[in-house]
């Protein structure tokens, strides 16, 4: 596990952040009724996602994220998805999950500052800080939260080899 603050060049990150915060309609968001594949649909926890890449580009936003692919020096890209966890009055810890059952690399790119966080299996809590990247093995259990002090918590989840 590694945390890197101010990972991206400030100019590029400001453009990236603008897609989410200043021009939210540029990204089509899709409602996901469950937090993960092991989570019951009976629960009220849900979020919005935008699948950018899985086996092939699924979004025009992929071209804008090419610097991410280059900076991570990956052998193979598995998936890129953007997440939008809307705010609630109380912070909600989402159920733990694994992104995939095989060992691989992962990164969570925080787009905005908020009181949300990612909780790793060992108890490490990684706060959502704009331009912070968490590098970790997403085949290990981890969980997300929403936020209470912004309209939403935005991040980009990257899975790769």
Name every feature range the model reports, one short phrase each:
Residues 1-75:
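Non-heme Fe(II)/2-oxoglutarate
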Residues 107-108, 150-161:
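A short hydrophobic beta-strand segment most commonly corresponding to one strand
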Residues 90-95, 102, 110-129:
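A short beta-strand-loop-beta hairpin characteristic of the jelly-roll/cupin
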Residues 87, 126-142:
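Conserved metal-binding segment of the jelly-roll/cupin
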């Amino acid at each position: 596990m590694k945390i890197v603050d101010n990972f991206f060049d400030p100019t590029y990150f400001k453009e990236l952040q603008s897609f989410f915060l200043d021009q939210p309609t540029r990204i089509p968001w899709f409602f996901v009724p469950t937090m993960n594949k092991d989570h019951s649909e009976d629960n009220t926890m849900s979020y919005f996602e935008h699948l950018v890449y899985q086996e092939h580009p699924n979004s025009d936003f992929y071209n804008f994220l090419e610097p991410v692919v280059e900076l991570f020096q990956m052998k193979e890209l598995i998936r890129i998805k953007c997440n939008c966890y809307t705010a609630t009055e109380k912070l909600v810890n989402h159920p733990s999950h694994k992104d995939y059952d095989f060992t691989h690399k992962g990164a969570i790119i925080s787009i905005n500052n908020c009181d949300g966080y990612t909780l790793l299996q060992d108890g490490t809590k990684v706060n959502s800080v704009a331009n912070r990247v968490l590098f970790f093995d997403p085949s290990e259990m981890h969980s997300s939260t929403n936020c209470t002090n912004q309209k939403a918590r935005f991040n980009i989840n990257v899975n790769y080899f």
